[in-house]
Amino acid sequence: MSAADSPDSRCDIEVVAPGPLSHVQDLGRDGWRHLGICRGGALDPACAALANALVGNRDDDAVLEFTLQGPSLRLPRPLRIALMGAVCEARFEGQWLPPARPIDLPAGVLSLGGMRSGVRGWLAVRGGLDTPRVLGSRATD
């Protein structure tokens, strides 16, 4: 998985430990239902779009959606992130991170633990997540 602060800037984010139900989502794909392909996309498009807005992304940039517990990710360089949705045990190098605001992090390990309340959360990274587009969407569902 990679993120970019600008179109010319990319970095690989390493998955240290996957969450049980973590996947990349955007706002989904339209126009394929006649072939039996669902729209897909984030389960709460407003939360995904708000997470993106907090870091300066477009509404439809890809985010990481996680359920019940998130992954642990190694950030190779400083990145701006935002967490939306359910409040989870989000920590960076052991320090608790607040939800619903942009956070500038240095290189290190971001751990998205179990949920304190709710079920799903969304992680946006400045520049979006650069995964392949399939039928017009980066969603991996």
Question: Language-model segments: which ranges?
Answer:
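Conserved "landmark" site that anchors the functional core of diverse proteins
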Residues: M1-D141
